[in-house]
């Protein structure tokens, strides 16, 4: 194995052993249909595509001119290291470099990562790719992701490791990562003095903008905005047309409320999950019919991005772009962004109604619930269930003409998508995953429902 690669892997292994792997994200770019057919691919793109000028927003706090489209590095391309006896998966750095170069070339200047993304390798890959460019040509965002070990010593180690991995001496946008309730916030940032440390780092110039990402209850959001005593430079919220007026799981606040509070306080909103974990890029067939009737040439993803981008207090919108065609489709939307008109907004209300009819599981595929101590592949199980449901190929009615075909596709596709030992019937209901889910999904309960559904299908010939 190449010495640099080996040292990199060993270093990140030690780091992730210390801080946990609760946000394992990445994989090899596997796309699986309801029937379980796989499609692994390398980047392909049309070289001569032309785009207009990227849309930019000015931060009212810092004056930064930020591209409305941001590159989220939660998932990056992987490759098999053929020089390794273990044939380990490693980040495909050459591919990452190409993606970042292409994005920068076309006006994207905001890049978001975390110490726990991509099995702990995202910051390093991001640093290698971006350090090849002048530092004043991009804004760099990372996070204090001290979920597993919130001690002061370990949190400080995580902070300093980020600078080393990212090859920088300052971070433009630093986030308190995924806070949603007071006790966890108190343990991770107040009791250990880390919040005071980060505020001091901002005064020293090593952090240019300090903010936080929110997953939680209304009371905690209100505390952070009105009672925390901190003047935040930005807040990252989950916002999309489905969440705008809808509350999910056991959360009690919608995106409209979050956005309007930030707008009134003149705090810029950074947007995560504009596609709801990819579900809005490929919604159910009824939703797609509504969109295609109005804009037959536009992708479903573009509708979701335009919804978020039409809101004036949005500074930037994160998108994970593992392939250059993803970047190109987004560039068509953001270069420049065309705000939604009234008829399009009305159509999206109809789309939301169809999505509520389908009763999908609200998993976004963030992988924060992983790894399961019993090996259950939680995101893959939910993805397969939702995929079959939203494709209109769900075997819930034995009297349906398509039932036998749909039943076969569901069962065969499940075995192709998820190894049998990692399926829902092996969940023991320990609940260790539940506190880590930003969507507040009652995961053991959903696993039980899916297991019962699968067993029912197996007994119905």
Residue ranges of each PLM-predicted region?
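Active-site groove signature of glycoside hydrolases
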Residues: 166-184
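Ferredoxin-like iron-sulfur electron-transfer modules
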Residues: 346-370, 404-429, 448, 452-461
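C-terminal segment of N-terminal export signals and the immediately downstream linker at the start
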Residues: 31-70, 83
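Short, acidic/polar
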Residues: 89-103, 151-165, 217-225, 301-305
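N-terminal export leaders
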Residues: 11-31
């Amino acid at each position: 194995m190449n010495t640099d690669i080996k040292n990199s892997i060993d270093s990140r292994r030690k780091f992730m052993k210390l801080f946990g792997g609760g946000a394992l994200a990445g994989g090899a770019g596997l796309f699986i249909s309801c029937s379980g057919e796989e499609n692994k691919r390398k980047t392909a793109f049309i070289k001569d595509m032309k785009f207009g000028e990227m849309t930019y927003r000015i931060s009212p706090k810092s004056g930064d001119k930020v591209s409305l489209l941001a590159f989220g590095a939660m998932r990056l391309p992987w490759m098999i290291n053929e020089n390794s006896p273990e044939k380990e998966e490693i980040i495909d750095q050459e591919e990452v470099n190409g993606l970042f170069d292409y994005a920068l070339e076309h006006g994207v200047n905001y890049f978001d990562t975390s110490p726990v993304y991509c099995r702990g390798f995202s910051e390093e890959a991001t640093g290698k790719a971006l350090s090849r460019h002048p530092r004043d040509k991009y804004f760099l965002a990372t996070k204090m992701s001290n979920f597993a070990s919130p001690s002061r010593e370990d949190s400080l180690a995580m902070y300093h490791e980020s600078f080393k991995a990212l090859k920088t001496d300052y971070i433009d946008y630093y986030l308190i990562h995924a806070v949603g309730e007071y006790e966890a916030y108190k343990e991770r940032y107040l009791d250990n003095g880390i919040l005071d440390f980060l505020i001091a780092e901002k005064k020293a110039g090593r952090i240019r903008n300090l903010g936080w990402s929110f997953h939680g209850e209304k009371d905690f959001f209100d505390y952070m905005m009105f009672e925390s005593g901190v003047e935040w430079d930005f807040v990252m919220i989950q916002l999309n047309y489905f969440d705008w007026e809808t509350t999910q799981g056991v959360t009690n606040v919608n995106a409209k409320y979050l956005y309007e509070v930030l707008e009134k306080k003149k705090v810029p909103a950074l947007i995560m999950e504009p596609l709801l974990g990819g579900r809005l890029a490929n919604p159910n067939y009824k939703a797609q019919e509504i969109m295609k009737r109005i804009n037959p040439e536009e992708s479903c993803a573009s509708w979701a991005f335009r919804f978020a981008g039409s809101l004036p207090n949005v500074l930037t919108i994160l998108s994970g772009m593992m392939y250059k065609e993803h970047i190109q489709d987004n560039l068509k939307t953001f270069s420049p962004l065309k705000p939604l008109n009234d008829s399009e907004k009305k159509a999206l209300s109809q789309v939301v109604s169809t999505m509520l009819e389908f009763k999908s599981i609200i998993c976004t595929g963030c992988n924060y619930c992983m790894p399961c101590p019993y090996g259950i592949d939680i995101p893959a199980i939910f993805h397969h269930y939702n995929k079959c449901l939203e494709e209109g190929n769900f075997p819930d009615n034995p009297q349906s003409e398509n039932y036998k075909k749909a039943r076969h596709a569901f069962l065969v596709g499940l075995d192709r998508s998820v190894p049998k030992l990692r399926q829902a019937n092996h969940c023991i209901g320990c609940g260790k995953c539940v506190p880590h889910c930003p969507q507040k999904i009652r995961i053991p309960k959903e696993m039980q429902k899916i297991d019962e559904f699968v067993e029912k299908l197996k007994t119905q010939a």
